Regions:
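N-terminal periplasmic/intermembrane-space "pro-region" immediately following the signal or transit peptide
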Residues: 1-46
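Surface-exposed loop and membrane-interface regions of Gram-negative outer-membrane beta-barrel proteins
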Residues: 51-55, 67-100, 115-126, 256-257
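Glycine-rich, histidine-containing beta strand-loop boundary motifs that form or position
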Residues: 75-77, 98-100, 107-111, 118, ...
Length: 337
């Protein structure tokens, strides 16, 4: 729509869903050791939504489309009911998107997930409430047609900026925290071939923007440490019949390079049978004890009491497997472990 294609002014209901669930656990939510966040059993990567005890009913509407050839909008309201809190309404996403030259510009709230992994993304996924942000992205990947960089093939760029909650000082109990700290990210995806994608990513919580952040010169003094970083790289390769992917990320920095590493690896088989009605995914992930915490920004790598990255948390390992059977015109049946 943003390039003038398609019908003008076609905002309409694109879909609706109802989620029925029942939750019974010892606590309403469990807490992490080194970050101010919480989690629930079997409820992850759900845009920060926590179920109430007992029966829950959640309905969502997906409305989107273009207002004209230069402006598209989207809104996803969510309506929930549980026996503890009764009725509740919230906004999963609400955004407007336009363009300037080769750049797409998005303003508003929209769920984003960067990196590879089905069970969770190490730096930034859909585990926490979506933030209101400004985002820039290339409308089409840039092609390196000739010259020394031709071997890179194509590249895409995504950049965003938002700010965190206004109660982070009070919730952490530390005067060194920062209310409404800036949260910024940049990701570059490089595609040397149609089968291979290589990604580079850096995300930062910023108390103050200065040259030291640009150079990666982190301070040893708590009074002068002004940011919390996660950065790293990932890749995906599409072989015939199987996709292989992995990522290696570092929590905070040492001498301009990420350290305190974590990783995930995975394999996806999109067609276990010739008709494509079955697929299989297997993943593994590991973090160390430094992940998602910070010695100055005590809330850690969180937003509204949820980890911004992988719900796995710090000092943890995970093995994940999922098999799905797709039913024609009905949906799918899945089993995960």
């Amino acid at each position: 729509y943003l390039q003038g294609a398609g019908k003008i002014n076609n905002v309409k209901l694109r879909g609706a869903s109802v989620d029925l669930s029942y939750l019974q656990q010892d606590s309403a939510a469990y807490k992490y050791n080194n970050a101010k966040a919480q989690w629930q059993l079997l409820n992850h990567n759900n845009n920060g939504y926590l179920y109430g005890d007992g029966f829950n009913a959640v309905g969502t509407l997906h409305i989107s489309g273009s207002l004209n050839k230069d402006l598209a909008v989207g809104i996803t309201p969510r309506f929930a009911w549980d026996k503890d809190e009764h009725g509740d309404a919230s906004l999963v996403e609400g955004y407007a998107k336009t363009h300037l030259g080769v750049w797409g510009i998005t303003a508003g709230r929209q769920p984003m997930s960067w990196g590879v992994g089905r069970a969770g993304q190490l730096a930034f996924g859909s585990n926490a409430t979506p933030q209101t942000a400004i985002k820039l992205n290339l409308l089409e990947p840039h092609t390196f047609d000739n010259g020394a960089l031709k071997f890179l093939g194509k590249a895409n760029v995504n950049v965003f900026a938002s700010r965190l909650e206004g109660n982070r000082v009070a919730s952490s109990g530390s005067a060194l925290e920062k209310n409404h700290a800036a949260f910024v990210g940049v990701r570059v995806d490089i595609m040397p071939t149609d089968a291979f994608t290589f990604g580079l990513e850096r995300m930062s919580m910023l108390k103050k923007f200065n040259k030291h952040w640009l150079l990666g010169d982190n301070a040893d003094d708590a009074e002068k440490d002004n940011w919390n970083d996660i950065a790293g790289l990932d890749f995906k390769y599409r072989f015939p019949g199987v996709q292989v992917y992995a990522s290696l990320y570092g929590e905070d920095q040492a001498h301009a390079f990420p350290c305190e590493n974590a990783y995930n690896v995975g394999m996806y088989f999109p067609q276990l049978v010739p008709d494509g009605s079955w697929d299989l995914r297997v993943e593994g992930a590991k973090t160390n004890d430094a992940w998602y915490g910070h010695w100055v920004l005590k809330n850690g790598w969180t937003y509204k009491d949820a980890i911004l990255g992988d719900w796995l948390g710090a000092d943890a390992k995970r093995v994940y497997a999922e098999v799905n059977h797709y039913l024609a015109d009905v949906g799918k049946l899945g089993l995960s472990y």
